[in-house]
Amino acid sequence: MEAGGFLDSLIYGACVVFTLGMFSAGLSDLRHMRMTRSVDNVQFLPFLTTEVNNLGWLSYGALKGDRILIVVNTVGAALQTLYILAYLHYCPRKRVVLLQTATLLGVLLLGYGYFWLLVPNPEARLQLLGLFCSVFTISMYLSPLADLAKVIQTKSTQCLSYPLTIATVLTSASWCLYGFRLRVPYIMVSNFPGIVTSFIRFWLFWKYPQEQDRNYWFLQT
């Protein structure tokens, strides 16, 4: 029991540390927006989809009584809100950003209404909410595949972040172990694609190293 308790504590701690580290990756974009007073080279949709993902898992954690999920996703949602507000402040096309935000939050509210009004059984609600969160998380991990195809076409990994890739694989692996230990398939399955896509990125970094890209740029200039 003591060994199992220590292992559980280690996994829980890894989930918190690695996930918060991954969410904090947006701080570099926040610093860039403040310094340049623009949103050049900053993508908005990752902030928005991560916000919705955090709110979904926060609801799941609250319904299940999982303190780890509650803490991690509360901090994550707060950080994503900060990034979204900063982007909105510096973005010249605020109408498009507001429309995207309202649309996705509207979908989230409709989901909440469905789960809490039309699914009265708490256990059934928990299962359906877990399924919804899993599908959304998997779609988040698979959405950058278009960028990976672009890397292969251009033979350049400049659009990829190596630190974020490390954070993603560590976070995904931690949550897979967390889901396995607690026997929660929604958490385990939804994070497995994060491991797969991260290793694809590692292969691309090995295949098309960024140092090579910089040397090529210097030769051209």
Swiss-Prot record:
Compartments, record wording: Golgi apparatus membrane; Cell membrane
Main subcellular location of this protein, as a coarse class: Golgi
Keyword match Ubl conjugation: no
Record keyword Ligase present: no
Domain of life, per lineage: Eukaryota
Entry GO terms, CC: endomembrane system; Golgi membrane; plasma membrane
An MF annotation (GO) of this entry: sugar transmembrane transporter activity
Keywords in alphabetical order: Cell membrane, Golgi apparatus, Membrane, Repeat, Sugar transport, Transmembrane, Transmembrane helix, Transport
Record field: transmembrane: 3-23, 42-62, 68-88, 96-116, 126-146, 160-180, 186-206
InterPro entries: SWEET (IPR047664), SWEET_rpt (IPR004316)
Role, per record: Mediates sugar transport across membranes. May stimulate V(D)J recombination by the activation of RAG1.
Self-association state and partner proteins as the record states: Interacts with TRPV2; the interaction probably occurs intracellularly and depends on TRPV2 N-glycosylation.
Protein name per UniProt: Sugar transporter SWEET1
Organism: Papio anubis
UniProt gene name: SLC50A1
